[in-house]
A protein has these predicted regions:
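Active-site loop/oxyanion-hole signature of alpha/beta-hydrolase fold enzymes
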Residues: 12-13, 50, 54, 60-97, ...
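Catalytic histidine neighborhood in serine/cysteine hydrolases
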Residues: 223-240
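Catalytic histidine-centered segment of alpha/beta-hydrolase-like enzymes
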Residues: 237-250
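Short beta-strand/loop motif that positions the catalytic acidic residue
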Residues: 199, 205-207, 211
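Alpha/beta-hydrolase fold catalytic core
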Residues: 1-28, 50-53, 91-92, 126, ...
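Flexible "cap/lid" loop of the alpha/beta hydrolase fold
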Residues: 104-111, 115-150
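Conserved HGGG/HGGXW glycine-rich cap/lid loop of the alpha/beta-hydrolase fold
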Residues: 20-65
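Conserved alpha/beta-hydrolase catalytic His-Asp/Glu region
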Residues: 131, 143-201
Length: 261
């Protein structure tokens, strides 16, 4: 974050949240993706500050300087935390900015709270349709767990299963603690399509066409389901479109922030 950012810690929703505050103007809450921190999205926060906004950038619990939740949270609990932050900071009708996992929280928040507008960047929220090979792997994996326990016992089988899971799973999963692995497994299986029609805030979708984590097809579904949504597709950019194509991203982001809605 920039030198002007003030670091704050608050006990909210039963946990400690670290976040930064900078700038003056209408409030913007910036939410990072899974495995990232407030620093990952610092360039987004800077753009919002330069557009004349007061920007709150969070470290979600389990990332950066915010400790892990004591329980296995889902998107609901992370959203309740952001609702608590808004109340704590006396933020009314914020502008929400969410990248990847942060987009999940933004969708849930905006579906039930007054929101000035929302920007979703390569956002998660659409549960992908699984291929037959996926289900074969899942059920083979579940069956193999039972066999391994019978042959090797509980402790050794647990270690073997964990190694296999890390090799087969996503890098996000492999690099996470046991608690955060359980949370990741929970949140990635949450489909938010049923909430999207309830989002009343004008919404800008900014997406990389080469995003393989949350493909552009997800953006098109969101554009269709969110009543007042528009899509800016950045050709050739990946899951971090704001880093891959910073110039195009900043132009689209700033124009939407400054637009009279």
């Amino acid at each position: 974050m920039s030198a002007e950012a003030e670091e704050r810690f608050a006990t909210l929703y039963g946990t400690t949240l670290r976040y930064t505050v900078q700038g003056e103007g209408s409030p913007v809450i910036v939410m990072h993706g899974w495995g990232c921190t407030a620093e990952t999205v610092s360039s987004i926060s800077r753009i919002a500050v330069n557009a004349g906004k007061r920007v709150y950038t969070v470290d979600f619990p389990g990332f950066g300087k915010s400790p892990e939740p004591a329980e296995t949270w889902g998107v609901e609990e992370y959203t309740c935390l952001i609702e608590s932050l808004a109340k704590h900071e006396q933020i009314e009708k914020p502008i929400l900015v969410g990248h990847s996992f942060g987009g999940r929280v933004g969708i849930v928040y905006a579906s039930r709270n007054k929101t000035d507008r929302m920007i979703l960047i390569d956002a998660a929220g659409i549960k992908p349709k699984r291929t037959l090979s996926y289900y074969v792997k899942v059920y083979t994996f579940k069956a193999s767990k039972r066999v391994l326990r019978l042959i090797y016992g509980e402790e050794r089988s647990r270690q073997m299963i964990e190694r296999r899971r890390c090799r087969a799973g996503s890098s996000d999963y492999a690099s996470a603690s046991p608690r955060m692995r359980m949370i990741l497994s929970k949140v990635v299986n949450e489909d938010l399509r049923h909430l999207m029609p309830k989002v009343n805030a004008p919404t800008l979708l900014i997406w990389g066409t080469a995003d393989t984590a949350t493909p552009i097809s997800d953006a098109k579904i969101m554009e269709r389901l969110i009543p007042d949504a528009g899509l800016v597709a950045i050709n050739g950019a990946g899951h971090y479109s704001f880093l891959d194509s910073p110039g195009i991203f900043e132009a689209a982001f700033t124009n939407f922030l400054k637009a009279q809605i």
